[in-house]
Regions:
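Non-catalytic C-terminal accessory region of glycerolipid acyltransferases
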Residues: 4, 129-242
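Short, basic, glycine/proline-bearing loop/turn elements
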Residues: 46, 118-122, 152
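Short, hinge-like loop/turn segments at secondary-structure boundaries
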Residues: 76, 113-115, 195-198
Length: 242
């Protein structure tokens, strides 16, 4: 029954919401080059997708974040629905780091660029480092938070080792890095599936880690700490409840 609902109800409405909100966002970008209006529309899009998919999101730990602060957010990534959940329930103006190849896709590439999202070139270590340096400069200059999936993509099982880009950007920009964990989304929409199951997921926020005084030589240790923190945030929900 839930598969038929997903196929005949949720997926068509997701496609419709994406077309409508994407068009509105692109039009809004003609008048607002800051990306703020596009982000507000993306938040509405995220909530719409979760609603038609019958996915509820419970947040924990948002009080740990300064509403006026700038952060580098890092999160685990297990499902396509992670992005709508983060847009809908993380109450910050933030931008994503997105694969450079996405910017070559008609309509999508122009929208990402106008919304202020940052392309990542992974063709070589030098190109990747240049992307990270440019991203750090944008964070420091604009005071806009960014969000990265340091696993480098969706993980079909467990938590993969983190790449150091988030730690590099946070240290270079001199802003705190905040670990996030999304628990339960893999069960509702696993990789390779179009069967969206109804249910609840948890978006849990860890303690922000300050980077003031850290040099780039400390990015490996910061990266290891971020991995441990996200792992622990996930373990809180995986542990048996007494």
């Amino acid at each position: 029954m839930s598969f038929l609902r997903s196929l005949l109800f949720s997926i068509p409405l997701i496609a419709l919401a994406t077309i409508v909100m994407g068009t509105l966002s692109l039009l809004a970008s003609l008048a607002d080059r800051t990306g703020r209006t596009q982000h507000q529309l993306a938040r509405f899009w995220g909530r719409a997708l979760l609603a038609v998919s019958f996915i509820r999101v419970r947040t924990e730990g948002l009080e740990k974040l300064d509403p006026r602060g700038t952060y580098v957010f890092v999160a685990n990534h297990a499902s396509y629905m992670d992005i709508p959940a983060l847009l809908a329930y993380l109450p910050f103006q933030f931008r994503f780091f997105a694969k450079k190849g996405l910017y070559r896709i008609p309509f999508l590439g122009g929208h990402l660029r106008r919304a202020g999202h940052i392309p990542v070139d992974r063709s070589s270590p030098r190109a990747s480092l240049k992307s990270m340096s440019e991203g750090a400069h944008i964070v420091a200059r604009r005071g806009t938070s960014v969000l990265l999936f340091p696993e480098g993509g969706r993980s079909p099982k467990g938590l993969r080792q983190f790449k150091e880009g988030a730690a590099y950007i946070a240290i270079k920009a001199g802003v705190p890095v905040a670990p996030l964990a999304i628990f339960g989304m893999r069960r509702l929409l696993p990789m390779g599936s179009i069967h969206i199951r109804p249910g609840e997921v948890v978006l849990r926020v860890g303690d922000p880690i300050p980077t003031a005084g850290l040099g780039l030589s400390g990015r490996a240790e910061l990266n290891r700490r971020l991995f441990r923190d996200v792992e622990q945030l996930l373990d809180v929900h995986m542990a048996p409840q007494g």
